[in-house]
């Protein structure tokens, strides 16, 4: 049973990051070259993901904790997000594209935490098995870049959103095959601090966790410069298959995720 479960979770992770990798790396080039957006507008578009990360998890986390099974919520978010991705190419002005992108990000970002939570809840040996399952997320990102670049040559076209949208709908349907994961806090009172995630701030009292959060905060600053500008830059330099080449950076993720169970066992 665990072998079948790990296979399903690995496929789930692959699809999830294939969606993300299909559009996130090359969107800046599409917005710049095809829609002729200005630099500030492109920066705001990439900020939509951060807005989704700040808004959506609180509401979706509340729904998953108290009202809906995680796999059904993942299915709804995946299918809804897929339809929004199909709609994005129709939005050719910033005033229409940007709000739609924010709404889409509010459907995708919560799937990251929900998927991790579901996986950790069902795996018997989380320290050994979760990093190996998670390895498929990096492989999915790499596969998305290669597919977009080599198969579709789509860095500058709307095809990236169609690829991501199709995969998102498949992801949503596949989520229904995951183990039933009912809400754990049904019938319990809801506090405002819990909805806003303020209870989690208590974790910052642990020095190791506080240092980890600080490091992640600092790392994400240059990371966004990379995602917003890198694909446009190398495209201007005349690189072919730029999204595919950039995706190969995830090879380091694969290596370290494979090594993580060994490190955790020591």
PLM feature segments, named:
Residues 1-3, 178-214:
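Juxtamembrane intracellular "pre-TM" segments in multi-pass secondary transporters
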Residues 2-50, 208-248:
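Helix-loop boundary and gating motifs at the non-cytosolic
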Residues 4-6, 89-101:
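Helix-loop junctions at membrane interfaces in 12-TM secondary transporters
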Residues 50-58, 141-142, 250-258:
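Residue-level signature of mid-helix packing/kink "hotspots" within the transmembrane helices
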Residues 55-69, 152-153, 256-266:
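Helix-to-loop junctions at the C-terminal end of transmembrane segments
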Residues 72-86:
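Structural signature of the two symmetry-related core transmembrane helices
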Residues 102-136:
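Cytoplasmic helix-loop-helix junction between adjacent transmembrane helices
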Residues 160-177:
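Symmetry-related core transmembrane helices of the 12-TM Major Facilitator Superfamily/SLC fold
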